[in-house]
Design a protein with these regions (language model features):
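Short alpha-helical
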Residues: 16-17, 81
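Short amphipathic alpha-helical segments
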Residues: 23, 129-130
Length: 139
């Protein structure tokens, strides 16, 4: 079965700031919108940012491979070269990383490159990649 796009709606504190981050920094094309929400083409998936005035994110962390991973988080598994290009784009834009781009589970079956950062509203994002994409669900 071909992979189907997912739909995810996340709260943001400011629609203009969300447009600048998702549209400008991440390069996601904008779809439909209204005063209180904006659709983005999030790497082939539908991400909707909904205005929630006064939003205060309260992150939680779980240890994974010696690092504190923010929970909840969302993101996409990219091709190797696209992941590296995105990491450089984020660095150039001055985005601060919660977990710097690097390798997790080195030498293990689940070895992957990953990075974590927050959008301006405190939503945690993770982007990851595998040299061999067939290892995504390998045990």
């Amino acid at each position: 079965m071909p992979l189907q796009p997912f739909h995810l709606a996340v709260p943001v504190h400011d629609i203009a700031v969300a447009r600048a981050f998702y549209g400008g920094t991440l390069g996601c094309a904008e779809g439909r919108s209204a005063a209180e929400w904006v659709d983005f083409d999030f790497f082939g998936h539908q991400l909707v940012t909904h205005l929630q005035a006064g939003r205060k994110a309260a992150p939680h962390y779980n240890p994974v491979d010696g690092q504190d991973v923010p929970v909840p988080h969302f993101g996409v598994v990219l091709q190797w070269q696209h992941w590296h290009a995105l990491a450089e784009r984020l660095r150039a834009a001055g985005v601060g990383f919660q977990i710097e781009p690097g390798i997790r589970f080195a030498g293990q079956v689940g070895e992957q490159a990953t990075m974590f950062f927050y959008d301006p509203s405190g939503n945690a994002l993770e982007f990851k990649t595998f040299r061999d994409p067939s290892r995504l669900f390998a045990k």
